[in-house]
Amino acid sequence: DHGENSLAAKLREIARRTGIRIVGPNCLGVMSLRTKLNASFAAAAAPAGDLAIISQSGAVAAGLIDWARAHHLGLSGLVSVGDMSDVNFADLLDHFALDASTRAIVLYIESITEAKRFLSAARAAARVKPVIVVKSGRHYEAAKAAATHTGALAGRDAVYEAAFRRAGLLRVNGLDEVFAAAETLGRVRPFNGKRLAILTNGGGLGVLAVDGLLDLGGETAKLAPETIEKLNAKLPSNWSKSNPIDIVGDADPQRFTDSLTETLADKGVDAVLAMHCPTALSTGAGAAEAVAKAVAAHRSKTLNAKPVFAVWFGGTPQLDAIFATARLPPFATAADALRGFMQMVRWRESRDALMRTPPDLPPDFKPDPARARRAIRQAISEGRQWLDQLEIVEVLDAYGVECASSVLATTPQEAAAAGRAYLITNGAVAVKIASRDITHKSDIGAVKLDLRTPEAVEEAARDILTRIPKLRPNAHIEGVTVHPMIVRPHGRELIAGIGDDPVFGPVVIFGRGGKAVERIADAALALPPLDLDLAHSLIARTRVRRVLDAYRDVPAADMDQIALTLVKLSQ
């Protein structure tokens, strides 16, 4: 029960009155590993380290503790927040962002209640350290279960995605990805670039890893000629001579040491994935120790050491211990390792985006919010939930968004007069019902297109004004609107608008438009306000972006104008 007279409400009142902070209720508890505090009922504590976990689910928190113990991964702290009657995500993000013993933060979220506080704290934390978030309830049934669990409204998952992106958080979609991220964050410091070299004693494994890397948006490193020359001197003549670096199935430990040392020294390499396939000629432990030796030597020579990710097939506790001592992240599969690598790349890109200076808006962009508010207040004073079409044009024009002109006509004769004026400069006009109660006009035949004479306009208006009131007797009908037909032989139909989310508030929507917009479902969301860079990023996340460039006899769309329109809408 979360109502005003619930036990949770009484608990909050006592906490406010006494100055006591409360974690929970309905939670696993709290751990601070460095101070040896264990105020939880977890089966066992995790080892001390520098990864913080904040979880809305006690079961997920318990699972992460058990996984951390099994993988020798240390935690700086763990808080199971439960129903968050007092202490919430924002409080804990603020704490761990300033905690010198925490290098990265993992969040498990089912719902958010104070969106503005959360986003502010998340943005501040993501600027200084990686923040990984897994959000359950991506589908309707799961979101409903999460809302029942936490007593909070879940909101649309696409809006959560937009909020996480704007705050610089790195989202993953399941606990397996959380584990991969935690393995990486616990042992790898942030690095520059995304050029990965793949080192392996099995050629097929290397080829599969390249496919996986490119699928995730990564980039294979191109070995420098001098690196290839040095490797030629130390490897058998049948090595691959390129990336992936196949050092051949009979590779002994020294071959792993030599090849990794030269690869790490290459300025065109940002990180290395080292993989080992067990053979009768090559033991896993010996190769692992050789890799650990090369990594230690590399770290001793530079402050900005390049990360090395390890995949040893046929893993054993002995191998885990070798990698843990060397602070190398080991993974069961190349897919897990590549996800971990790309998560670090994506976090760095998100952090860089948070730190950049937004581009200036055009000097002639001078919005008139007061004019827009007048139109909206008029609708509110009349108890309406929708603006009519002319009011919408008024609001958009106040923010510099160009709209096709239109005229409201209350009779067929007025419509004919408006059509006659438009037909002087346009080949055809359109007539639509004017009603704040009818949103999908074409569904009921309330749109007439390609009208080329005043008589045709008059007849279309008469038909609409006679027929639609019978179909929708409860709808308030102001008349019809007359518009010039805008014909673009190579035009693309797009949608741009503002939605309202119950958790995060206004969101900007962009995507493919048209009557089938819901069926096609090609849209992306972003939190306002936008600048030009953010608007271009929003456009790039849609499939329709691919057809906005020039192709065959179709000219390119004006991407800067589309982006500027989104910026104006977001204001």
Question: Which residues are covered by each model-predicted region?
Answer:
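Catalytic-core regions of core metabolic enzymes
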Residues: 1-571
